[in-house]
Each structure stands twice: as structure tokens, then as C-alpha cells.
């Protein structure tokens, strides 16, 4: 996976309040311009960085920073610098140069997510501590997060998976992409899992879970009709078998986006990130 994150730009201020300032940003991801938002808390800092990976929203209706606005606000008020990447092809970002319409299981988006961290590090913003990095991914963004954690485990210190898609790319493909034009082109290029298991393994974080280093906080609702809860059941079990640090929280009755349990979800998320991203006092 080629990685080059550079030229972070704070383009303009979207809004400001007593807790944080929200900036429209752009950065270069492998030479492409990718847009997003960055919430920087008030105060001296430096504040830990949390990257947000959003779920699937059609590019035709997507707008800058869309998808996790409540969560962006909450964590910024908790003292985290929150960078929400739009991904290539979304918001004000450049389009992907790959026009084959072959399913890639979010690997390009994972590049954009990692490159966001690298761009912040290059920029050396005085109020952001980019050596302490958390990541939060919802749905598709949960899959993007798993791709980051398994391909470049040194990048992220702690991760929150919010109703994530499957770690097996074939399962995601057959559930959402197989009936589209992309499905036909993908089958032509890669075949099925039975025909070409190595190709599908290469797209799947499932086969690389042993690489994972960061502690994970995993959430899923029992009434999620978009992403089956048993996918997270299986992921939690597999991570536990591998000896990885995972905490799995199931919310009875919650759907794909939490409502009654949202406050509890965010309190647990903030507590986890504070614990994992706070520097250890050497004294």
C-alpha cells in the first residue's frame, strides 16, 4: 500500500464555539486532494488526534464532513482534535484515478485515512499531538478502520468500531455490490471466493487480524438491519482467540445508528480514548 500524506491546509473556518473551532481542510493523499473537516479544541493542547472514517453515503449527495456530526462535536468537546476525512471521490475531494469499477473493499479509503495522519504529522500543528492517534469508524468506515489497523498497525494507538462491516471482503461484496455493474466487473477481474480465494483474502482484513496491535472498543446494536450483528460477534470472538485486546458492547434494541444508547456509547468511547491516548506520567 503506497502512502504519502502531505500538504495539510486549513482552508477556512466553518464555525467556532466556546469548546472548539471547526476548519474546512484538505490534504494530499498519494497526490490526490482529499477534503474533510478538523475540529481543534480551545486551549493550549496539544490534543490527541482522532481520525473519523464515515460509512457509505452516495457521493452524489455527500457533503463535506457528513456522516458523524454528533460524534465529531462530542469528542471535540472532550478535548480531542477530530479529523473527519471525506475520502477520495466525496465532498471536495479529487476522484479516484482507478476507473475500472472493481470492488476494492475500501482499500483506497484506508490509504486516505492513513495519509490524513501522515499529513497532520508533516504539518506539525502546535495544538495537535499526532503521536497519539485514535480512530473511529462507522459501518463501511469500520471496515476502513480495520484495513488501517491490520495493514499499518503502527499508525493507530486505539480504535472504536461502530457497527462495522465484515472483515471478510467477500461477505461485504455479496451483500451490497454483487447486483451492480461493479459486481459484474469485479467477478470478471477477481472471480468468486471459491474460484480465486487468494485475491479475496488479499482484500480482507480478516486474514491479517494477527497484525493488529491497537486495543479495540467494538459496538453493535441487536436490531441492526443494515449490518448483521453476528458479524461483530464473529469479529470479537476471532480477536479474542488471537489474544487481541477487544471490548465488545452489544446494545439491545439499537439499530445501525444508535439513538437511545447514543449517550452511553459516546461516554464509553470518550473514556476509552482518554485512557488509551493519555500520556503515561513517568513519575
Q: Where would I find each of the regions flagged by the language model?
A:
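N-terminal cap/lid segment of alpha/beta-hydrolase-fold proteins
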Residues: 3-44
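Short substrate-entry loop that stabilizes the transition state in hydrolases
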Residues: 45-47, 55-94, 168
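Mobile cap/lid helix-loop segments that gate and shape the active-site cleft of serine hydrolases
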Residues: 59-62, 157, 164, 168-208, ...
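Short glycine-enriched nucleophile-adjacent loop
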Residues: 118, 142-153
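Alpha/beta-hydrolase fold nucleophile elbow
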Residues: 126-138
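Short beta-strand/loop motif that positions the catalytic acidic residue
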Residues: 212, 218-220, 224
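C-terminal catalytic histidine-bearing segment of alpha/beta-hydrolase fold enzymes
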Residues: 233-236, 240-283
Amino acid at each position: 500500500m503506497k502512502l504519502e500524506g502531505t500538504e495539510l491546509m486549513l482552508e477556512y473556518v466553518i464555525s467556532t464555539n466556546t469548546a472548539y473551532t471547526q476548519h474546512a481542510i484538505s490534504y494530499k493523499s498519494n497526490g490526490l486532494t482529499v477534503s474533510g473537516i478538523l475540529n481543534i479544541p480551545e486551549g493550549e493542547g496539544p490534543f490527541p488526534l482522532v481520525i473519523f472514517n464515515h460509512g457509505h453515503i452516495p457521493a452524489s449527495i455527500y457533503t463535506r464532513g457528513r456522516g458523524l456530526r454528533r460524534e465529531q462535536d462530542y469528542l471535540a468537546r472532550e478535548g480531542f482534535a477530530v479529523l473527519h476525512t471525506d475520502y477520495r471521490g466525496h465532498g471536495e475531494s479529487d476522484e479516484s484515478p482507478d476507473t475500472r469499477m472493481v470492488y476494492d473493499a475500501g482499500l483506497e479509503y484506508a490509504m486516505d485515512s492513513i495519509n490524513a495522519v501522515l499529513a497532520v504529522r508533516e504539518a506539525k500543528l502546535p495544538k495537535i499531538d499526532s503521536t497519539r492517534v485514535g480512530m473511529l469508524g462507522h459501518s463501511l468506515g469500520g471496515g476502513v478502520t480495520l484495513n488501517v489497523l491490520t495493514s499499518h498497525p503502527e499508525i493507530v494507538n486505539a480504535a472504536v468500531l461502530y457497527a462495522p462491516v465484515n472483515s471478510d471482503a467477500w461477505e461485504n461484496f455479496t451483500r451490497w455490490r454483487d447486483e451492480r455493474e461493479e459486481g459484474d466487473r469485479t467477478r470478471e477481474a477477481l472471480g468468486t471466493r471459491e474460484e480465486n480465494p487468494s485475491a479475496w483474502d488479499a482484500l480482507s482484513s480478516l486474514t491479517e487480524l494477527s497484525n493488529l496491535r491497537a486495543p479495540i472498543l467494538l459496538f453493535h446494536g441487536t436490531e441492526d438491519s443494515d449490518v448483521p450483528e453476528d458479524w461483530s460477534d464473529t469479529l470479537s470472538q476471532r480477536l479474542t482467540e488471537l489474544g487481541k485486546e477487544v471490548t465488545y458492547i452489544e446494545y439491545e434494541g439499537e439499530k445501525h445508528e444508535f439513538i437511545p444508547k447514543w449517550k452511553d456509547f459516546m461516554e464509553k468511547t470518550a473514556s476509552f480514548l482518554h485512557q488509551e491516548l493519555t500520556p503515561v506520567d513517568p513519575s
